[in-house]
A protein has these predicted regions:
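Sec-dependent signal peptide recognition
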Residues: 2-10
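C-terminal motif of bacterial Sec signal peptides marking the signal peptidase cleavage site
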Residues: 15-16
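Aromatic- and glycine-rich peptidoglycan recognition patches
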Residues: 19-24, 28, 34, 69, ...
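Solvent-exposed, polar/charged alpha-helical surfaces in well-ordered, non-transmembrane soluble domains
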Residues: 30, 34, 38, 58-62, ...
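Catalytic cysteine-centered active-site loop
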Residues: 42-92
C-alpha cells in the first residue's frame, strides 16, 4: 500500500511540475506577463536586456521573445507595431506608451498585467526604481500616458 501511494505521489508531482513550468500551455498574453514578472526587482540599465540590468524596451522584447513573438527593441519602433486601441480595452500583454519628457516623442513603455479600479496596471523598467508594477491611476503615469497598442490578438 505504501509503495503504491509513493508511486502515485511521484507521478502526480512529475506531471504537475511540468504543467506549472510549461509556457506552451499558457495563452501568449499570459506568457508575456509571466516572463515579464520574472524581472521584478531587476535594476534599470539603459540598453540592458538581462537580470543584471534592463530598460523598458528590453523587458518587452525579452518577455515577448520567450513566447516566440518577435518585436522591436526600441520604444520608437515598438510604437509602430500592432494595433492602437483605447486604454479601457487594454488586456494583459498589451503595451502602454508614455511621453516622459517635454518632447512629443514617446520615451517609455510597459506591459499591461491587469486592471485595477478601471485603469490598467503595468510592469515596466523605471529608471529610478528598476522593474516594478505601476498603475495609470498614479498621477505621473496618468499625465505621461500617450497610447495603448495590442500586439497579440
Amino acid at each position: 500500500m505504501r509503495k503504491s501511494f509513493g508511486f502515485i505521489a511521484l507521478v502526480f508531482l512529475a506531471t504537475s511540475c511540468g504543467m506549472l513550468k510549461g509556457s506552451k500551455k499558457m495563452k501568449p498574453r499570459d506568457g508575456v506577463v509571466f516572463y515579464a514578472k520574472e524581472y521584478l526587482g531587476t535594476p534599470y540599465r539603459l540598453g540592458g536586456n538581462n537580470h543584471s540590468g534592463i530598460d523598458c524596451s528590453g523587458l518587452i522584447h525579452n518577455a515577448y521573445k520567450k513566447q516566440g513573438i518577435s518585436v522591436s527593441r526600441t520604444v520608437n519602433l515598438l510604437r509602430k507595431e500592432g494595433k492602437r486601441i483605447s486604454k479601457d480595452r487594454a488586456k494583459p500583454g498589451d503595451l502602454l506608451f508614455f511621453r516622459t519628457t517635454k518632447k512629443r516623442k514617446l520615451t517609455h513603455a510597459g506591459i499591461v498585467v491587469g486592471q485595477k479600479g478601471g485603469e490598467p496596471i503595468f510592469i515596466h523598467a523605471s529608471s529610478s526604481r528598476g522593474v516594478i508594477i505601476s498603475s495609470l491611476r498614479e498621477g505621473y503615469w496618468n499625465k505621461a500616458y500617450a497610447q495603448t497598442r495590442r500586439l497579440i490578438r
